[in-house]
Amino acid sequence: MRGVIAQITPNSSIPKEVDFHGGIAFLDRDGVLNVGYSTYVNSPQEVNMLPGAGKSVAILRRKGWKICIVTNQSPVMRGLWDENTLHDINDELRRQLLDEDEGAHVDVILACPHRSRDRCACRKPYPGMLFLGSEIIRGGNYDNSNLIDGRGIIAINPMLRNVDWWGTKTEPPHRLDLMLGDRKCDLGVAWAYGARIFRANPDIGIAGQINEMIDEGNEGVTFNPVG
């Protein structure tokens, strides 16, 4: 499988409570929005939203951010389950978020299905998913020819794997772009893309970081990708 598994919510289905200020909140999934397990989240029945996740997503939206979930999901390429199961899992997470707060809409969910050995440009810490999310949300150019009702595979530019980890952190497409995750690969992808970097406690998730994230003057944590 080449490319990212995408779920894109049509703009018409998302209520515009506030104006989009241009920033995107990139969120890891497991350990940020729902409980993560060492054996993966393998079915909708295993989706357990972390308390306050729905309210936190709604806060971000009401403050002007759009939401893009970016998650590594190698079980697809490992043959544990398929693309349809992934969509079912994500649909259940969306449902739980909205049950907690009706404003907790997610604009885009992107999942890398690859293993480390597949050497793709989308598996975090490589920044392919973040740049793709930016293109989708900001109306840039991307190949949507394989999408049906906003779902399907989108190819990633393999050159996005060429990251100078010994260089300096790049500038993001927008100064308010941020990334929240619970693992080193999440910090790395934020650095490679240029986003403000926030780290979640996987037992608490996004609710433990939301006040810092919405502070536009907070640059987040410092991260050295080769340290």
Predicted feature residues:
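Short alpha-helical scaffold segments that flank and stabilize functional sites
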Residues: 28, 56-59, 74, 136, ...
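Substrate-recognition element of Asp-dependent hydrolases with the DxDx(T/V) motif
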Residues: 53, 57-90, 104-118
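A short alpha-helix capping/helix-coil boundary motif
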Residues: 34-37, 72-73, 164-167
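Metal-dependent phosphoesterase signature
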Residues: 24-51, 76-85, 99-102, 114-120
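Short loop/turn and capping residues at structural boundaries
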Residues: 37, 68-71, 110, 145, ...
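Asp-based, Mg2+/Mn2+-dependent phosphohydrolase catalytic module
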Residues: 1-25, 84, 91-103, 117-227
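Active-site neighborhood of HAD-like aspartate-dependent phosphohydrolases
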Residues: 1-68
